[in-house]
Amino acid sequence: MSNKVHLGHTARKRFGQNFLTDSNVINRIVGAISPDNDHVMVEIGPGLAALTEPVAESIDKLTVVELDKDLVERLQTHPFLKDKLEIHQGDALKFDFKQLVEEGKQMKVFGNLPYNISTPLMFHLFEFAEHIENMHFMLQKEVVLRLSAAPGTKAYGRLTVMAQYFCQVMPVLEVPPGCFTPPPKVDSAVVRLVPYKEKPYPCKDVDLLRHLCTTAFNMRRKTLRNNLKQLLNDDDFSALGIDASMRPEQITVQQYVAMANHLVDKRQA
């Protein structure tokens, strides 16, 4: 049998499917997720139910978002899961997670995410951060390093700033390729993201912060003065106490928020 086939289902490259099969890793992830009935439990991309089954065992209801129609049909006829699942067949990148919120309950979101959509999906989920208690995701190890990076490091970038603006980021465990069918060509890792109830550095315009980060990191080797010349001048940098000759990866989340807030104030003046 091909190493791309698991439980009779062939992994589809266009969906970025790699199915988690190592029971020890599965148990550790489920332990980190800590399923309960006090939250709306949401899984993105349940696949062949490696995480779905053990999570559903300890709760009354699990909501899943799955794009692959064949996998949705398997879940709908699953002898144990079918009565516990609320299934949404569709693209998680376009899904309105706010519709899953129940009165008095925050969401716990988790999944073994397709690596080809993980970064845009992170940005999409940040839009619903106020409704989320925590998130646990299996991602490409490189993405976890970017999410948790410190200023001044190679991994630090736009994703880092936006993730750490919205959430506390904690790597949980590393997962080698042999834990999957088929084995991915990269190392994987699990990350825990906990949205802030009160942000350490509140931003007056998050869309502007996002635009500022995109513009700043567009050319990593250039200075802030060069990259942000359409937005901020030397007087602005001086007022903010930021050295305009620094590179974008040297600037903290707090400083990016300060720049965005300064721009908002300038426009309102």
From Swiss-Prot:
**What Gene Ontology cellular component terms go with this record?**
cytosol
Q: What is this enzyme's EC?
A: 2.1.1.182
SMART domains under this entry? Answer: rADc
Q: What reaction(s) does this enzyme catalyze?
A: adenosine(1518)/adenosine(1519) in 16S rRNA + 4 S-adenosyl-L-methionine = N(6)-dimethyladenosine(1518)/N(6)-dimethyladenosine(1519) in 16S rRNA + 4 S-adenosyl-L-homocysteine + 4 H(+)
Where does the chain bind S-adenosyl-L-methionine?
N18, L20, G45, E66, D91, N112
Among Pfam families, the record links this protein to: RrnaAD
| Top EC category | transferase
Checking SUPFAM superfamilies in the record gives: S-adenosyl-L-methionine-dependent methyltransferases
> Where in the cell is the protein located?
Cytoplasm
Q: Does the keyword Repeat apply?
A: no
UniProt keywords, alphabetically: Cytoplasm, Methyltransferase, RNA-binding, rRNA processing, S-adenosyl-L-methionine, Transferase
Where would you say this protein principally sits, based on its record? cytoplasm
| One GO molecular-function entry | RNA binding
Q: Which InterPro entries match?
A: KsgA/Erm, rRNA_Ade_diMease-like_C, rRNA_Ade_Mease_Trfase_CS, rRNA_Ade_methylase_Trfase_N, rRNA_adenine_dimethylase, SAM-dependent_MTases_sf
Q: What does the sequence similarity comment in the record state about its family?
A: Belongs to the class I-like SAM-binding methyltransferase superfamily. rRNA adenine N(6)-methyltransferase family. RsmA subfamily.
Matching HAMAP family, A to Z?
16SrRNA_methyltr_A
What biological function has been recorded for the protein in this entry?
Answer: Specifically dimethylates two adjacent adenosines (A1518 and A1519) in the loop of a conserved hairpin near the 3'-end of 16S rRNA in the 30S particle. May play a critical role in biogenesis of 30S subunits.
NCBIfam families linked to this entry = ksgA
Recorded protein name is: Ribosomal RNA small subunit methyltransferase A
The organism is Shewanella loihica (strain ATCC BAA-1088 / PV-4)
Name the gene that codes for it.
rsmA
